[in-house]
């Protein structure tokens, strides 16, 4: 027996530890490997580079509204394939696949509840549902949110994350742009605040309608916001676009949005703004939502 064989015979292999799927994830921006549970506590914000990852509609609403106050609205509304539309796949099959993947019936979730004790109606897009595209049910649920806000005489907040109108519903999808905008006119007539929060991405027919009609238009950092995508624009105008074009930082420089707010600071910022607009006492900044960790912004100078 050679010396190599003698060494190999004395080596006892260790049993490989199995790590359950979903325990770890990687930041899309900096590549840092992150503990999934910690990332969720940080509201899907990377603690290393402050990259704001996409967040599910329900997690967003649960992180915004007071615990125990949430009541879902419009959950009975379901999409129908009235046009029998088919591209490379039947629309009804796309719907079934998206519903199975996300657990949602459509791309918009609406809830009413309280924010620091203040009544509010909130809506959030589920981007994982067909790219957060707007169809008839999305429009109907948004109008339901407006009607509930009018009934309760309270503010409305909408978190947009959408690729635009849903092509599989053709003109019925485009009609939602006018339908939702007309509903918001009633909020304006009543003098009730509507705050639009633009997250990554907010594009197409959604950005061209209710997403940009807020009394305040707030964006998350580095969110892509626009109508057509940058690649489409470059191919059309045959010019190179400026760095950061259509990102929230670019838009605030041009006056297209009102402010940029980090996600961990969004809840208190919205509560403070709405309390002022509704002539209510300011929320207590020393009473953060239970279970939510508010990570500080990374020190950009130290990273450089």
Curated annotation (Swiss-Prot):
The keyword ATP-binding applies. Zn(2+) binds at residues 27, 30, 46, 49. Pathway: Lipid metabolism; malonyl-CoA biosynthesis; malonyl-CoA from acetyl-CoA: step 1/1. Residues 283-304 are annotated as: Disordered. GO terms for biological process: fatty acid biosynthetic process; malonyl-CoA biosynthetic process; negative regulation of translation. It catalyses: N(6)-carboxybiotinyl-L-lysyl-[protein] + acetyl-CoA = N(6)-biotinyl-L-lysyl-[protein] + malonyl-CoA. It is found in: Cytoplasm. NCBIfam families: accD (TIGR00515). Component of the acetyl coenzyme A carboxylase (ACC) complex. Biotin carboxylase (BC) catalyzes the carboxylation of biotin on its carrier protein (BCCP) and then the CO(2) group is transferred by the transcarboxylase to acetyl-CoA to form malonyl-CoA. Acetyl-CoA carboxylase is a heterohexamer composed of biotin carboxyl carrier protein (AccB), biotin carboxylase (AccC) and two subunits each of ACCase subunit alpha (AccA) and ACCase subunit beta (AccD). The keyword Endoplasmic reticulum does not apply. Its main location: cytoplasm. Residues 23-292 form the CoA carboxyltransferase N-terminal domain. Its cofactor is Zn(2+). Coiled coil: none annotated. This is Acetyl-coenzyme A carboxylase carboxyl transferase subunit beta. Binds 1 zinc ion per subunit. It comes from Salmonella typhimurium (strain LT2 / SGSC1412 / ATCC 700720). InterPro entries: AcCoA_carboxyl_beta, Acetyl_CoA_COase_Trfase_b_su, ClpP/crotonase-like_dom_sf, COA_CT_N, Znf-ACC. GO terms for molecular function: acetyl-CoA carboxylase activity; ATP binding; carboxyl- or carbamoyltransferase activity; zinc ion binding. Keywords: ATP-binding, Cytoplasm, Fatty acid biosynthesis, Fatty acid metabolism, Lipid biosynthesis, Lipid metabolism, Metal-binding, Nucleotide-binding, Transferase, Zinc, Zinc-finger.
């Amino acid at each position: 027996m050679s010396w190599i064989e003698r060494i190999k015979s004395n080596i006892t292999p260790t049993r490989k530890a199995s790590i359950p799927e979903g325990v770890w994830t990687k930041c899309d921006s900096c590549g840092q490997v992150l503990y999934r549970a910690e990332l969720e506590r940080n509201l899907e914000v990377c603690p290393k580079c402050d990259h704001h990852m996409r967040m599910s509609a329900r997690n967003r609403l649960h992180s915004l509204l007071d615990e125990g106050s949430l009541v879902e609205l419009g959950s009975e509304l379901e999409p129908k394939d009235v046009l029998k539309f088919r591209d490379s796949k039947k629309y009804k099959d796309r719907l079934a696949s998206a519903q199975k993947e996300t657990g949602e019936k459509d791309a918009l979730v609406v809830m009413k509840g309280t924010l620091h004790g203040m009544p509010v109606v909130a809506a959030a897009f589920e981007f994982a549902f067909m790219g957060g595209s707007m169809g008839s049910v999305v429009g109907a649920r948004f109008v339901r949110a407006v009607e509930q806000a009018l009934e309760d005489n309270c503010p409305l907040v909408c978190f947009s994350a959408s690729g635009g109108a849903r092509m599989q519903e053709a003109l019925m999808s485009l009609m939602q742009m006018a339908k939702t905008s007309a509903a918001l006119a009633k909020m304006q007539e009543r003098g009730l605040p509507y705050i639009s929060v633009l997250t990554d991405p907010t594009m197409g027919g959604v950005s061209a309608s209710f997403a940009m009609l807020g009394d305040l238009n707030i964006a998350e950092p580095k969110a892509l916001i626009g109508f057509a995508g940058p690649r489409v624009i470059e191919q059309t105008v045959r010019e190179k676009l400026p760095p950061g074009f259509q990102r929230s930082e670019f838009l605030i420089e041009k006056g297209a949005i009102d402010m940029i707010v980090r996600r961990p600071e969004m809840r208190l910022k919205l509560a403070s703004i709405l309390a002022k607009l509704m002539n209510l006492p300011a929320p207590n900044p020393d009473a953060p939502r239970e279970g939510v960790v508010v990570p500080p912004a990374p020190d950009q100078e130290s990273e450089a």
